[in-house]
Amino acid sequence: MVNYPHKISSQKRQAPPSQTKNFANRGMSFEKMINATNDYYLSHGLAVIHKKPTPIQIVRVDYPQRSRAKIVEAYFRQASTTDYSGVYDGYYIDFEAKETRQKHAIPMKNFHHHQIQHMEQVLAQRGICFVLLHFASQQETYLLPAVDLIRFYHQDKGQKSMPLGYIRENGYRIELGAFPQIPYLDIIKEHLLGGKTR
């Protein structure tokens, strides 16, 4: 192997190993943006909103070495409700976040009956409840109030997806920014609270 100036090797470059597609964390970039937004709100004293942990029951753990324990069998203890909850200006906040690669709709299979029931219960207690929807292929993000999701869920049970047109008509578009990345509190304050705070 000969090194040329600027440390360029004469050896043929090997192609990087092919990567298999992993769809498990398909929504992670959107989730990371929400988490960064929530961190911003927390550090600036605007809101305290956290991601809810998923309740998991660990069944079996392998200990090949004491420092390398590996969970090999686990299951969900109970169905989780929504992704995030917290407090903003004395109001309870509860919301779900969904990302899709589809251009014109969000699949309704992403919303489970127990989640709809939970949202109904939050609204019955006068909490603020909504869904953040991100259309990755179009880079469009919306806040859809829970009442509109629930109405669609009950009226159109046979439909497999919620059209983007319905979301645009009933939701609020969020322009993505730098700090915070997803300024959803602006929508809550202006549209869901009518500009007033406590």
Swiss-Prot record:
InterPro entries for the chain: Resolv_RecU, Restrct_endonuc-II-like, tRNA_endonuc-like_dom_sf
Cofactor annotation remark: Binds 1 Mg(2+) ion per subunit.
Residues bound to Mg(2+): T81, D83, E96, Q115
GO biological process assignments: chromosome segregation; DNA recombination; DNA repair
Annotated region (Disordered), positions in chain: 1-23
Top-rank taxon, per record: Bacteria
Subcellular location: Cytoplasm
Residues marked Transition state stabilizer (site): K98
Protein's UniProt keywords contain GTP-binding: no
Function (record text): Endonuclease that resolves Holliday junction intermediates in genetic recombination. Cleaves mobile four-strand junctions by introducing symmetrical nicks in paired strands. Promotes annealing of linear ssDNA with homologous dsDNA. Required for DNA repair, homologous recombination and chromosome segregation.
Protein name: Holliday junction resolvase RecU
Organism for this UniProt entry: Streptococcus oralis
